[in-house]
Amino acid sequence: MNIKNSRARNALMMWCGVVLHDTKCALFRILIFCTGCTVLVGPIQGAEISQTIETVKASVVGVGTFQQSRSPAMSFVGTGFIVDDGFHVITNAHVIPKILDSEHMETIGIVIGKGDDTEFRPAVIVAEDAEHDLALLKISGAPLPALKLGDSGLAKEGQSFIFTGFPLGMALGLHRATHHAMLAAITPVVMPALDSRKLDVKMIAQLRKSPFSIFQLDGTAYPGNSGSPLYDPETGVVYGVINMVFVKGLKETAITQPSGISYAIPANFARDLLRQKTQ
């Protein structure tokens, strides 16, 4: 680049943050601190992510129960998301209540809508995978927009994801919130116990098997996020299902003093569960 006009050269330096190392050389060696590039790219990426989130939110639902004699009649404690044909929902197994008040016709289902404009859709349990903390529901009514389950084996440590759900369930109402998370590690599901007295029956059972791998995330999730889709911010493809957080001390501190460490079940286990609907 041969710049003869010093004014033009100075203007270029001011605009692009260019440091010229040798003004006598025909081809200048330059060091560019050009923030203009990030200004151009940033908003485009932000717009793409915003569009992805809006698309995904249409498939994210609350998972809970309905009981006419109860106030409020609708109650949800976790999150789920629509997959496959628009009639199936993936969530965590621990979100599904083990006992229903059948005497008062309590029903499992999903909650859709936003804010005060909500609708309850009854659902039935199609399949459940307690080992991987997953459940598959089938809803009635019209189909809803479905998300695609990706190959979680392709996920890499350091990859950025986002997840959408209802962090505190009913406490914040039916307002979907989205959070960033980085895949910090792919680790065995059984976390080491420094004290053998802290091992429970479930942990011992897992240790006797070959522990499957789980996604450890550098991101803050809350109890109501259980069942939230963990997805690619550009494509919306789901690679995991949020299922637990690392708790420091008592369970209550998961809300008041979150550790910032969350976990997700790889989506391949959800894909396996989905295949059971046709068996």
Model-inferred region functions:
Residues 1-25:
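N-terminal secretory signal peptides that target proteins for export/translocation
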Residues 51-52, 99, 124-126, 140-175:
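Active-site substrate-binding loop(s) of clan PA
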Residues 104-110, 115-123, 157-162, 176-200:
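Beta-strand/loop subdomains of soluble extracytoplasmic proteins
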